[in-house]
Amino acid sequence: MTVSFRHGVASGDPYQDSFVIWSRVSDVDGSSASVNWEVSSSPKFKKRTILDSGTISTSSDRDWTVKALPEGLQAGEDYYYRFEVDGVVSPVGHASTLPEQAPSVRMAVLSCANFTNTEFFETYRRVAEIDAQQPYDIILHLGDYIYEYGQGGYPSAESAVENRGFEPDSELLSLDDYRQRYAQYHSDAGLREMRASAPMVTIWDDHETANDSWFGGAENHQSDVEGDWGARRDAALQAYYEWMPIREPALRRD
């Protein structure tokens, strides 16, 4: 089976001279993959327009996700990026650096995205359509990017759209559970289009881990049957960092 980029591309956390770029490879034949990336001033990626490039290794340890931090870019400029493995090229994403000064900022602001509710989840596609006509400077997501419930938890099974149930169909507890839910979310074409259209700035709320979570637990966590809260929380946040185009401690600069 040929390697693919079925979960799309994304960018995020823009600075005046850099931003994070993200993708995920699927159907890898082996225990790891070397992923090439390029950032260009042109969507055609002619050699003279390539401004930064590199290679990143990924594996199942990162759920086959990759992030890069191109630097040395100019403030307030548009850029294009893509990834490549074994001759297979990802979709092209668009990102922009922050301007040195801006009299105004154009943002799309989103939160609380329940995959099973297609009526509201369609908002992602609409954001991408609007961006194509009137580009956003950033896409700001204020959390509840995913929901941790199992089938029938939220919304009720009766209101879930046929063939649009949660994967896995049980409540998320393990790292594999959370990873599977993120993969399901990014099977949505509208979400992929939006993430490729403009840089994202994101924070988590509670449902990225569990409903009404706090340091020592959550309303939707029962330690006697669901295990250690700290292990669940850490698994949830690991998956979040893997799938979101944001800076991690290893990507931060002093």
Can you name each region flagged by the protein language model?
Residues 1-254:
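Metal-dependent phosphoester/phosphodiester hydrolase catalytic core
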